[in-house]
Amino acid sequence: MFDQDDAAFSRPGGEACGAAPARPIDLAHLARQTMDDRDLEREVLSLFVQQALSVRDKILDADATQRRALAHGLKGAARGVGAMAIAEWAERAEEHPQDLRLLRRLAGLIRQVRDFIAAIDR
């Protein structure tokens, strides 16, 4: 009988290694939303990146009301494609439109998602 401490049951790198970082896009969610249509996935992701970059470029110069509207639209689009971290931070930005720290974090997440989508689209 094997002991759970055997190498076959231990984590590569030991117990101290953390969980793998989550992908910026939940690809299983996206596949469900697009009924596993890969062409539709690419199209939806392309449209999402365009919208997200547009929000990123406009949100810092917008007033509080405009920031709320931009963040709200981004939140819904992000949930639709499975970009849950962007959706979460967009919701925070919607609730606190004057918090520049939130807006910068959101911009960073948008860059990560853009880069992730570019990498999977190769």
Model regions: which residues?
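Signal-transduction coiled-coil helices of two-component systems
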Residues: I59-A62, V81, A93
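Helix-loop segments that flank and shape redox-cofactor active sites
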Residues: S54-R68
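Amphipathic, coiled-coil-like alpha-helical segments
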Residues: M1-A28, D39, E43-S54, A77-W89, ...
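Conserved catalytic core of two-component sensor histidine kinases, primarily the HATPase_c ATP-binding
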Residues: A31
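An anion-binding catalytic pocket shared by soluble metabolic enzymes
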Residues: L74
